Amino acid sequence: MSFDIAKYPTLALVDSTQELRLLPKESLPKLCDELRRYLLDSVSRSSGHFASGLGTVELTVALHYVYNTPFDQLIWDVGHQAYPHKILTGRRDKIGTIRQKGGLHPFPWRGESEYDVLSVGHSSTSISAGIGIAVAAEKEGKNRRTVCVIGDGAITAGMAFEAMNHAGDIRPDMLVILNDNEMSISENVGALNNHLAQLLSGKLYSSLREGGKKVFSGVPPIKELLKRTEEHIKGMVVPGTLFEELGFNYIGPVDGHDVLGLITTLKNMRDLKGPQFLHIMTKKGRGYEPAEKDPITFHAVPKFDPSSGCLPKSSGGLPSYSKIFGDWLCETAAKDNKLMAITPAMREGSGMVEFSRKFPDRYFDVAIAEQHAVTFAAGLAIGGYKPIVAIYSTFLQRAYDQVLHDVAIQKLPVLFAIDRAGIVGADGQTHQGAFDLSYLRCIPEMVIMTPSDENECRQMLYTGYHYNDGPSAVRYPRGNAVGVELTPLEKLPIGKGIVKRRGEKLAILNFGTLMPEAAKVAESLNATLVDMRFVKPLDEALILEMAASHEALVTVEENAIMGGAGSGVNEVLMAHRKPVPVLNIGLPDFFIPQGTQEEMRAELGLDAAGMEAKIKAWLA
């Protein structure tokens, strides 16, 4: 879409933060209004993360107005809320391309702009990186400032508290801003608290505070009395005791939608020494009533008509794999009260809404705490229950040691339902489920299953749930199932694949939901097609049979080739001294960028045409 200067006259004056800082303060509320409307107009036409950005418009304007970005370094946690930041930093006219192949990255990305200090996508990394950046800036000696913006969900993660604990110890000059959109602005976050915040952040208070500490530092009883008096005064009105205990100077809460008030507070805090903490209250979806009322639904949106206030409904076609999992979960829980389901803040995405309502006492959302989720599941298993950890492939990476140390070594029967395995599409490099087979396959006694369709997915979940000799995992993709008939649940024989088609010289060993594409290739090339089903343990007998009866083998998977299922097949053949040629087809050795799943599979040669071309070129 082209930028409409007449519709956004103030925003038209701002294509960089340098231009923003030339505007008079009085025009900033109007700029915020135009920025919010432009965000609505753009995202409704292109799709993308939506409600979070609406809530950070005033904060974004205030930060870039007060701080000398990009010289001063601004770090956004996760990045869902960073669309206004992109618009104000030279990417205004390209915002309609966000999350599209070749377009703007969905999150702050170092390779895209000098304003994007840290590439992000996963949560709770900002403060740790910010401390390192602040320490580097201090050693540089150019008075470069560091600011981290983190949400109320991301700050619950252990990594954020580990970082704050470290900051309290080494005391770098930095500002952490908590964007708290859990609730609307309440009465006690009004004029009085804003006035108090400006007083507490002002030079007079800070001078008195630090001066008093120096004067009385040698008199322990008076020092302690001073500390307690200060805590008592601030504790009456400031809910920041936890952050103060971690070593931060806490300011807030303040109204995150008062751009002029934010500017005053940020200017007061800009030159304070040591770690500072500013708590702002915002409303997710601010300025667009449907998003304010339902921020979860409007968190990430497809293209929609903003005048309707509704998102387009599903066509009612095939269910998603997440829905298949959710239905199986409810069905199984109704029969077994030992089932416990765990998610790290991904209830909707993992298909667990219905389960959470039907079985609230057996549903555990542990927040953004993947490490805790896995070890919590280990504890439930020790206690005699049957835990299921529903988690995205890209987020399970964050709990790898817990899978190893707390589950696998102890042979605990924890089932991992791994959603978003393989190419996920528009969220790009940070969210592709490219590595789970590689990092799980090397864990001793782990059972790993890759269904080729929704019926097999259900059977594998059932098999894993009833496997009691250690952990198991079922990995399935983002997107809809293929429409096969669902048969009664039964346990699959562990480590056994099945031949789907008999051919001649070539055998294709398929792992997972690329099966429809592999089937087209097998038909075209008159190849044998095998649904391997298990990545671990591999069906070694079937692999050796295929090697003995065919001139060449091809493995197919939507996982990194390095260390993946195909690598396992290679290892089996080498161990048995079988010199049959093998072509491994999978994800290449680079981070897969954004684009639709169809676009990326075609580009990577993982659709039927691409696979066939690769095989023919290899055989030539």
Swiss-Prot record:
GO function terms (MF aspect): 1-deoxy-D-xylulose-5-phosphate synthase activity; magnesium ion binding; protein homodimerization activity; thiamine pyrophosphate binding
InterPro entries according to UniProt: Dxylulose-5-P_synthase, THDP-binding, Transketo_C/PFOR_II, Transketolase-like_Pyr-bd, Transketolase_BS, Transketolase_C, Transketolase_CS
Recorded consequence of changing R398A: Loss of activity
EC category name: transferase
Residues the entry annotates as binding Mg(2+): D152, N181
UniProt-annotated binding residues for thiamine diphosphate: H80, G121, H122, S123, G153, A154, N181, Y288, E370
Cofactor binding: number and manner: Binds 1 Mg(2+) ion per subunit. Binds 1 thiamine pyrophosphate per subunit.
GO biological process: 1-deoxy-D-xylulose 5-phosphate biosynthetic process; isopentenyl diphosphate biosynthetic process, methylerythritol 4-phosphate pathway; isoprenoid biosynthetic process; pyridoxine biosynthetic process; terpenoid biosynthetic process; thiamine biosynthetic process; ubiquinone biosynthetic process
Effect of Y392F: Increases activity 3-fold
Pathway as given in its UniProt record: Metabolic intermediate biosynthesis; 1-deoxy-D-xylulose 5-phosphate biosynthesis; 1-deoxy-D-xylulose 5-phosphate from D-glyceraldehyde 3-phosphate and pyruvate: step 1/1
Protein name listed in UniProt: 1-deoxy-D-xylulose-5-phosphate synthase
Biological classification of the source: Bacteria, Pseudomonadati, Pseudomonadota, Gammaproteobacteria, Enterobacterales
